[in-house]
């Protein structure tokens, strides 16, 4: 068994034998403490700096973010601890084919800024369900989608990041899992609740820098340990566990490990599925997912949003080099643990009989890095976990507040929405903690593939509805709802079948039904997209077309339509979410006047009460962005909403040139590694 010369030889009887019983050195602890102080300082600075007492200020960071924090936040929101653990684990187990998801994301994030975002800006939307409410009318589709988004966030994103973070924290630090994660969640929730999206974006920018420094450092150590890329290509195919059964194919490296495009029938990621089946969930994630779109909507203008997307697209090249290749290096250096093939030994090594490839990245951190740098990489993993959780907390809070709560209480004041949004973050924290035992009990042998298979069952119908709504004016509510429900039902059936008939281990016969065994999840994504597309088109053709209000400024072809009424009306109050669905904005002005009068009276009462408020109450109100400022409030409710799609010609030209360069780089990478 190959191991670091400085580490003690682990014994197979110890369930944590894969990691030496190291304790953090003082330098490691100092780095971790400095990191947490940095994050809290940046979070509190952005909390003081930005306006948090309006819907736009809290949920969209005031709409004045410049390109670089937007780009950093896009990358940090996407690359969580699940990426570090999952991508490196998939690289160790099956080679670099999983990189296709990252390269696919390059095109999708650029499509967001150049194609989808102009439609969202023209339509003046805060959330994705709100766009569908304006585009199709009614409440069936937005409510269904809001619930689905929250389901996906809580039970896939939070659970996956929790699992990945748990692997790193528990296995490497030997800390109490609940204590560590509760502490992380407490810090994460504090600046999310206090600062809103601005705090999340600024801390994401800091954490992106830390992630890149730490991950690039580990990449250098990894390649040095195996003799560079040539050494990796030679040694990877020899990386076999010494205790592997000689007559078994289990645990063997794949012959196509260094290729992205693989056999269309027998491989783990068939190339037609990569080209077509993978693109639909990728479009959902980058172009219609609240977590991602919310960051670009917070940009100052369309040019800054494009700049941020370009920055994220360039950064998406890095996961292959800082995650996938190091995962493959980990298999070369530690084959007995990372490449274990015997279920009993895997159970002893990492408490997972399905395989231990997911320990590849933390194994590298603890074995290769010297004192101090080990603490830096601990901070990197914590940064990845926290940046993902803050993104999910803020975006889920936005959806719940603006789409579900606003539907239940259409006359809710701005103050009430601010309180509800922050309380919902606390509920998410509670759900996250309660979800930890479920994550611990789940099988994580193929963490990243698990994420993508779930995505392929639930996301294609939603993506098709958005695409049809944005690019076909004839699409109506009945067609979109029919396609969405049929697609989700089919996806849920396949999801349930996958849970009932889990994939057998390598040494077991595959007795699953043919629809589960023979239809790859990427092929199922293609089938699901086609069924949804045909349903939406057919029902829309056979029913009445949408009204002009539901099309104007809400599709690609109508985004430049003239503005019918004053555009400041929607931004003055959250009420237009319910008003616009009926296409009768004439009645909105009286509603807004009523709401402002109502809130002014409530604020007068609150001002009278400030003399009796304790310091604790004042602190809580400050955290919630509702400190008293006098009776002249609220002029802040009339924040301007960006509706202009105009760009400075020189800036637009530079961005378009960068777009061509970025796409060319992506095509080259596809071709080189295909």
Curated annotation (Swiss-Prot):
It is a multi-pass membrane protein. It catalyses: myo-inositol(out) + 2 Na(+)(out) = myo-inositol(in) + 2 Na(+)(in); 1D-chiro-inositol(out) + 2 Na(+)(out) = 1D-chiro-inositol(in) + 2 Na(+)(in); D-glucose(out) + 2 Na(+)(out) = D-glucose(in) + 2 Na(+)(in); D-xylose(out) + 2 Na(+)(out) = D-xylose(in) + 2 Na(+)(in). MI transport activity inhibited by D-chiro-inositol (DCI), phlorizin (Pz) and sodium (Na(+)). Insulin increases D-chiro-inositol uptake. NCBIfam families: sss (TIGR00813). The gene is SLC5A11. This is Sodium/myo-inositol cotransporter 2. GO terms for cellular component: apical plasma membrane; plasma membrane. Its main location: membrane. The keyword Transport applies. It comes from the Eukaryota. It holds the Pfam family SSF. Involved in the sodium-dependent cotransport of myo-inositol (MI) with a Na(+):MI stoichiometry of 2:1. Exclusively responsible for apical MI transport and absorption in intestine. Can also transport D-chiro-inositol (DCI) but not L-fucose. Exhibits stereospecific cotransport of both D-glucose and D-xylose. May induce apoptosis through the TNF-alpha, PDCD1 pathway. May play a role in the regulation of MI concentration in serum, involving reabsorption in at least the proximal tubule of the kidney. It comes from Sus scrofa (Pig). InterPro entries: Na/Glc_symporter_sf (IPR038377), Na/solute_symporter (IPR001734). It is found in: Membrane; Apical cell membrane. Keywords: Apoptosis, Cell membrane, Ion transport, Membrane, Sodium, Sodium transport, Sugar transport, Symport, Transmembrane, Transmembrane helix, Transport. GO terms for molecular function: D-glucose:sodium symporter activity; myo-inositol transmembrane transporter activity. The lineage of its organism: Eukaryota, Metazoa, Chordata, Craniata, Vertebrata. Disulfide bonds: none annotated. The keyword ATP-binding does not apply. Residues 1-27, 78-102, 162-180, 230-272, 330-374, 440-446, 501-518 are extracellular. Belongs to the sodium:solute symporter (SSF) (TC 2.A.21) family. Residues 49-56, 124-140, 202-208, 294-308, 398-418, 468-479, 540-653 are cytoplasmic. The chain crosses the membrane at residues 28-48, 57-77, 103-123, 141-161, 181-201, 209-229, 273-293, 309-329, 375-397, 419-439, 447-467, 480-500, 519-539, 654-674. GO terms for biological process: apoptotic process; myo-inositol transport.
């Amino acid at each position: 068994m190959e191991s670091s010369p400085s580490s003690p030889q682990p014994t197979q009887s110890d369930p944590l034998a894969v990691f030496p019983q190291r304790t953090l050195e003082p330098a490691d602890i100092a780095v971790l403490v400095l990191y947490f102080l940095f994050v809290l300082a940046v979070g509190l600075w952005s909390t003081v700096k930005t306006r948090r007492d309006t819907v736009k200020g809290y949920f969209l960071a005031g709409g004045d973010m410049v390109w670089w924090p937007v780009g950093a936040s896009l990358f940090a929101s996407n690359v969580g601890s699940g990426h570090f653990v999952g991508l490196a684990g998939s690289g160790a187990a099956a080679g670099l084919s999983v990189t296709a998801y990252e390269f696919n994301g390059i095109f999708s994030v650029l499509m967001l800024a150049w194609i989808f975002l102009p439609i969202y800006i023209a339509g003046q939307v805060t959330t994705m369900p709100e766009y569908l409410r304006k585009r199709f009318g009614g409440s069936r589709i937005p409510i269904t989608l809001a619930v689905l988004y929250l389901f996906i966030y809580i039970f896939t994103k939070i659970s996956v990041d929790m699992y990945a973070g748990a692997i790193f924290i528990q296995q490497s630090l030997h800390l109490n899992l609940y204590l560590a994660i509760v502490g992380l969640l407490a810090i994460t929730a504090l600046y999310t609740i206090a600062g809103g999206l601005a705090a999340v974006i600024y801390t994401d920018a800091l954490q992106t820098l830390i992630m890149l420094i730490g991950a690039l450092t580990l990449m250098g150590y990894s390649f040095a340990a195996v003799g560079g890329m040539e050494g990796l290509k030679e040694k990877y195919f020899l990386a076999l566990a010494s205790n592997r059964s000689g007559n078994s194919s289990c645990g063997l490296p794949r012959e196509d490990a260094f290729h992205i495009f693989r056999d269309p029938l027998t491989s783990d990621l068939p190339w037609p599925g990569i080209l077509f089946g993978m693109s639909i969930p990728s479009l959902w994630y980058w172009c219609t997912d609240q977590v991602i779109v919310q960051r670009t909507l917070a940009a100052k203008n369309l040019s800054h949003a494009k700049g941020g997307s370009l920055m994220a697209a360039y950064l998406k090249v890095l996961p292959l080099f800082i995650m996938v290749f190091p995962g493959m290096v980990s298999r070369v250096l530690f084959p007995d643990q990372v490449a274990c093939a015997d279920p009993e030994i895997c159970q002893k090594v990492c408490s997972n009989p399905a395989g231990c490839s997911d320990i590849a990245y933390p194994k590298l951190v603890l074995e290769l890095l010297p004192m101090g740098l080990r603490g830096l990489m601990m901070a990197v993993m914590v940064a990845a976990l926290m940046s993902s959780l803050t993104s999910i907390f803020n975006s889920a809070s936005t959806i719940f507040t603006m789409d579900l709560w606003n539907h239940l209480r259409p006359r809710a004041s701005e103050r009430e929405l601010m309180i509800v949004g922050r309380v919902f973050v606390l509920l998410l924290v509670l759900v996250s903690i309660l979800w930890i035992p479920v994550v611990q009990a789940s099988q994580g042998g193929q963490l990243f593939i698990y994420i993508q298979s779930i995505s392929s069952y639930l996301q294609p119908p939603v993506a098709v509805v958005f695409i049809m709504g944005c690019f076909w004016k004839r699409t109506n509510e009945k067609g979109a709802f029919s396609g969405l429900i049929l697609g989700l039902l089919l996806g849920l059936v396949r999801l349930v079948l996958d849970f009932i008939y889990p994939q057998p281990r390598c040494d077991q016969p595959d007795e699953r039904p043919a629809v589960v065994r023979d239809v790859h999840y990427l092929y199922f994504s293609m089938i699901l997209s086609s069924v949804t597309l045909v349903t939406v088109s057919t029902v829309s053709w056979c029913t009445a077309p949408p009204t002009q209000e539901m099309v104007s400024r809400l599709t690609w072809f109508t985004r430049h339509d003239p503005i019918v009424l004053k555009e400041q009306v929607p931004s003055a109050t959250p009420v237009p979410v319910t008003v616009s669905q009926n296409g009768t904005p004439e009645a909105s002005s009286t509603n807004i006047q009523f709401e402002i009068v109502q809130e002014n009276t409530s604020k007068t009462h609150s001002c009278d009460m400030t003399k009796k408020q304790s310091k604790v109450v004042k602190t809580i109100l400050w955290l919630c962005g509702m400190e008293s400022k006098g009776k002249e409030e609220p002029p802040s409710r009339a924040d301007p909403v960006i509706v202009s799609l105009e760009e400075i010609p020189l800036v637009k030209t530079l961005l378009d040139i960068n777009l061509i360069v970025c796409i060319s780089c992506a095509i080259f990478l596809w071709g080189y590694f295909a």
